[in-house]
Amino acid sequence: MKSFPRADRIGSSIQRGVSEILRKGLGDPRLDMATITGVKVSRDLGVAYVYYVIPGDTAGRAAAAAGFKSAEGFIKRSLAGMLKMKYMPDIRFRYDESFAYGQSIDTVLRELQTEKDDVPDSGRPPEDD
């Protein structure tokens, strides 16, 4: 995918801004444990997709999604004041599936390592057939 430096710079600024807003606290307990993992800004700078992770199960993810949905307007206004942009992109929050995927890969690798450790070593080199 082609990189657009201005979109990348704006994405980095939005990520820092949203992280700062979350750190200071929104007063919404559904978002207390949320972590912003990245921001992708569309080529036309009209939409910023903010990716987040939150510990817990799918109920926690659903609660966080509802929390972000209700806070979108506040976060956008706060960012507009922080970034001083002429036009602020629409903010859309998305759960970062890559984090969960990475955790599942890590779990599989740990299980394979445990199975390997459980196989007794005969101390002999493998025989050739």
Swiss-Prot record:
Family, per entry: Belongs to the RbfA family.
Superkingdom per UniProt: Bacteria
Protein name (record): Ribosome-binding factor A
Cellular compartment(s): Cytoplasm
Any Gene Ontology CC annotation: cytosol
Record's keyword annotation contains Glycoprotein: no
Keyword terms: Cytoplasm, Ribosome biogenesis
Any Pfam family hit: RBFA
A single GO molecular function term of this UniProt record: ribosomal small subunit binding
Keyword field contains Cytoplasm: yes
GO BP terms, alphabetized: maturation of SSU-rRNA
Gene: rbfA
